[in-house]
């Protein structure tokens, strides 16, 4: 259904045209490969997916469906039926393959009802199970999906697994059990929760590193940005997805949020609320673009907040949204840097060259989407449209959309990658901001951390959870 307001309709149509440009460019120059290099007009394959192909196709499926791009959806489905192959002798990122491939296939199944997507999702889920063969049951980050041999990132603290990686399997794995009738997926993720619950949390905070062999924390670094972010998101969403029956997830979420408020949330002298990083008790006054998702998270969770705190969390979400908007507004390109700082007189600005890039990330418009849905304050549509205009001015190229190496510089230095999440997330959230609320209402649908749609689970799924405990 089209929005009633002609101006909103026109903006929504523009965002659909952006999706068409991104998709058609991918199809023309990189079809079947993982991602597109829009400047050199060729395919790009990230090592995150090993030799699995088609990341952009699977990631874009539900966006194509929602935007009514039917012929494109059908050609994507045909490619998946004929060419999506998980029998590869290669090492993949369990987290990335879960959120993009499993999430994308589940979402496409729930939206379209096409059996091929369910079948492929479950087939891939089974391939990921050997990652859990560790002494603690905390999965490896990397898995060879043919041999079943896993390991962790060599840079991660003392061989640790990463909180945001093993903590961002829960929603998809609950759905895999629901759709396959096999409780093993739910058991694996409920065990992760059990391990986390038994551990002592420093100041109530969850460190980013956990050793899968000893089941103990690695370095005491805490972040709501990269390495931590989606763990917290999935606690809240696990509770919402269970029709609010998963009270353990709810308690873990609100306890964590309380510790975050006490130890990490600060206000700059210029009045901007930000979320710092915690390193063994010392704060680093830096906020990542990835952390900007938290505005939407706080607002989405406001409804279930402890007595009298709902308004507080909506306001906190609005403050984070404002800070992240400032990080965009204070650049030349009007797109935000990868990380921005609040120290030495700087506020919401990247001070290091290696933090000045923008890779088409969605977290800021994701927060605008939740804030729009939950408050209908027109500024969120205004800010979203600013982002659309900046993307069109600076990231759109003849061969698709490219990330930028420096958002403060007066002309574009392209990174030559059209990220699959630009189609999965950034364009989807923008489209939803200019759609009516009855397109994917929040009371029926949960977005995974790659913006893939998962319905609230019917009550029969609770049986699986109970048996696990």
Curated annotation (Swiss-Prot):
SUPFAM superfamilies: Seven-hairpin glycosidases. It catalyses: N(4)-(alpha-D-Man-(1->2)-alpha-D-Man-(1->2)-alpha-D-Man-(1->3)-[alpha-D-Man-(1->2)-alpha-D-Man-(1->3)-[alpha-D-Man-(1->2)-alpha-D-Man-(1->6)]-alpha-D-Man-(1->6)]-beta-D-Man-(1->4)-beta-D-GlcNAc-(1->4)-beta-D-GlcNAc)-L-asparaginyl-[protein] (N-glucan mannose isomer 9A1,2,3B1,2,3) + 4 H2O = N(4)-(alpha-D-Man-(1->3)-[alpha-D-Man-(1->3)-[alpha-D-Man-(1->6)]-alpha-D-Man-(1->6)]-beta-D-Man-(1->4)-beta-D-GlcNAc-(1->4)-beta-D-GlcNAc)-L-asparaginyl-[protein] (N-glucan mannose isomer 5A1,2) + 4 beta-D-mannose; N(4)-(alpha-D-Man-(1->2)-alpha-D-Man-(1->2)-alpha-D-Man-(1->3)-[alpha-D-Man-(1->3)-[alpha-D-Man-(1->2)-alpha-D-Man-(1->6)]-alpha-D-Man-(1->6)]-beta-D-Man-(1->4)-beta-D-GlcNAc-(1->4)-beta-D-GlcNAc)-L-asparaginyl-[protein] (N-glucan mannose isomer 8A1,2,3B1,3) + 3 H2O = N(4)-(alpha-D-Man-(1->3)-[alpha-D-Man-(1->3)-[alpha-D-Man-(1->6)]-alpha-D-Man-(1->6)]-beta-D-Man-(1->4)-beta-D-GlcNAc-(1->4)-beta-D-GlcNAc)-L-asparaginyl-[protein] (N-glucan mannose isomer 5A1,2) + 3 beta-D-mannose. Pathway: Protein modification; protein glycosylation. GO terms for biological process: carbohydrate metabolic process; protein glycosylation. Disulfide bonds join 292-324. It is found in: Golgi apparatus membrane. The keyword Endoplasmic reticulum does not apply. The keyword 4Fe-4S does not apply. The active site is at 338 (proton donor). One of its GO terms (molecular function) is mannosyl-oligosaccharide 1,2-alpha-mannosidase activity. Its cofactor is Ca(2+). Pfam families: Glyco_hydro_47 (PF01532). Ca(2+) binds at residue 449. Gene3D superfamilies: 1.50.10.10. It is a single-pass type II membrane protein. One of its GO terms (cellular component) is Golgi membrane. Belongs to the glycosyl hydrolase 47 family. This is Mannosyl-oligosaccharide 1,2-alpha-mannosidase IA. The gene is MAN1A1.
